[in-house]
Amino acid sequence: MQVSVETTEGLGRRMTVQVPAEQVEEKVDQRLRSLRGNVRMDGFRPGKVPLKVVRKRYGPQVRGEVLSELVQSTYSEALREKELRPAGNPEIEPKQTEEGKDLEYQATFEVLPSFEVTGLDQIKVERPQVEITDADVDEVLERLRKQQAEYNEVDRASQEGDRVVIDFKGTVDGEEFSGNEGNDVPVVLGAGQMPPAFEEGLTGVKAGDETTIEHTFPEEFPDSEVAGKAGQFAVTVKTVEAPEYPEIDDAFAEKVGVKEGGVEKLREAIKTNLERERDQTVASRVKHQVMDQLLDITDIELPKVLVDAEIDQLRQQEQSRQQQSGQEEPDDLPAALFEENARRRVALGLIVNELVRSNDIKLDRDRVMQSLQEMAAGYEQPEEVLRYYAQNRQLMEGVEVAVLEDQVVDYVVQQAQVEDKPMSLQELMSPQQPEAESAEGESKQDETKE
């Protein structure tokens, strides 16, 4: 077999493969002789049909099958010989397939980039240090208490903490829109479940009042027909209800799910949950900083085939999200909407894979099991969840990739300049830091290509 490779543009490669005619014809003859034993034809005993007759009838079909198989096997062999790592499936163009001549074809594809990740000691990470206090537990208890409130109608103007039950109907530019009306909708003032303009408009109203509330939809509102536009909502107040909050005692603890141990066990459970949320948020913040700076310090050329595949995946996710939210069938979303995010995700996937490869980072099976157990603990039947994951290889791979990414982050943090920053739980949980992105899709994709 002869193999030659030329660079087309950037990461593009064109590989020409020649397979000797003798090898091709030997494979064809072997297949025909094997087929001969099963051929049934009038005038011949079973298995005794002359080879030339079998060749005449089945030769073209068998030859096509053999050529297809040879292309697949020799393509993989040629990649190994030339030490090439394709980023996606090739385009195969046959050049010579005539009987008695060498098989020749060209495979066009992109390769994964060759690069190094250096300068990890220049990465700076600010790691939050948060202690869960009694005040943090008290705050959660108070929220639980308010969630268990019982509401009773009152004959007075509404105020913060009250529940106002309303009917509403909205228009934009005088036209109705999807989801523009609701009946018997409960709104707890101060809970943040409605836009500020709504809560302000519903403060100080009484049962039977009719009012109009104006609200401008944000530019990023999912429904593009009303995004960024001002809406007018005609509102009828059905009832105003004042809350009555329960005492925090053992009966309250049992009501919110703590069957034994009363308030003391409830406080312990709350603290445990807060510690878990803290740890997850700290890990997310650290991961985001690491990923940002890995992108900054690494110069990498991205295979177009991977970026295009990621764009398609992000587009499908957005279309699915729009459909699930009850919006009309979305129009074809342009690739430009997703390109920046797609390039970022692909780059991170390649960088993570390179760090795994170059530093021989092995998947920690104990961490995989720990991650599964923590996830399953949030369900009523954790054992069933664990069993389901164990039987679903695709789901398990997702957990494994996420754990491997966390191991890469840990490795980078060990090399980086880390500053521990004390802060309160409220500071930590404030929505100021974007959620750490994952290179999961790309990591899995690229691992299969190596």
Swiss-Prot record:
Biased composition (Basic and acidic residues) is annotated at 441-450
Gene Ontology molecular function: peptidyl-prolyl cis-trans isomerase activity; protein folding chaperone; ribosome binding
Quick one: a GO cellular component term?
Answer: cytoplasm
Q: Name one Pfam family in it.
A: Trigger_N
The annotated region (Disordered) lies at 422-450
* EC top class named in words: isomerase
Domain PPIase FKBP-type per the UniProt entry, residue ranges:
161-246
Q: Which InterPro entries match?
A: PPIase_dom_sf (IPR046357), PPIase_FKBP_dom (IPR001179), Trig_fac (IPR005215), Trigger_fac_C (IPR008880), Trigger_fac_C_sf (IPR037041), Trigger_fac_ribosome-bd_bac (IPR008881), Trigger_fac_ribosome-bd_sf (IPR036611), Trigger_fact/SurA_dom_sf (IPR027304)
Q: What is its EC number?
A: 5.2.1.8
Q: Where in the cell is it found?
A: Cytoplasm
UniProt keyword terms in alphabetical order: Cell cycle, Cell division, Chaperone, Cytoplasm, Isomerase, Rotamase
A GO BP entry: chaperone-mediated protein folding
Swiss-Prot/TrEMBL catalytic activity: [protein]-peptidylproline (omega=180) = [protein]-peptidylproline (omega=0)
What is stated about domains?
Consists of 3 domains; the N-terminus binds the ribosome, the middle domain has PPIase activity, while the C-terminus has intrinsic chaperone activity on its own.
Q: Which family does it belong to?
A: Belongs to the FKBP-type PPIase family. Tig subfamily.
Q: What does this protein do?
A: Involved in protein export. Acts as a chaperone by maintaining the newly synthesized protein in an open conformation. Functions as a peptidyl-prolyl cis-trans isomerase.
Please state what the protein is called: Trigger factor
Which organism is this entry from? Alkalilimnicola ehrlichii (strain ATCC BAA-1101 / DSM 17681 / MLHE-1)
Phylogenetic lineage: Bacteria, Pseudomonadati, Pseudomonadota, Gammaproteobacteria, Chromatiales
State which gene encodes it: tig
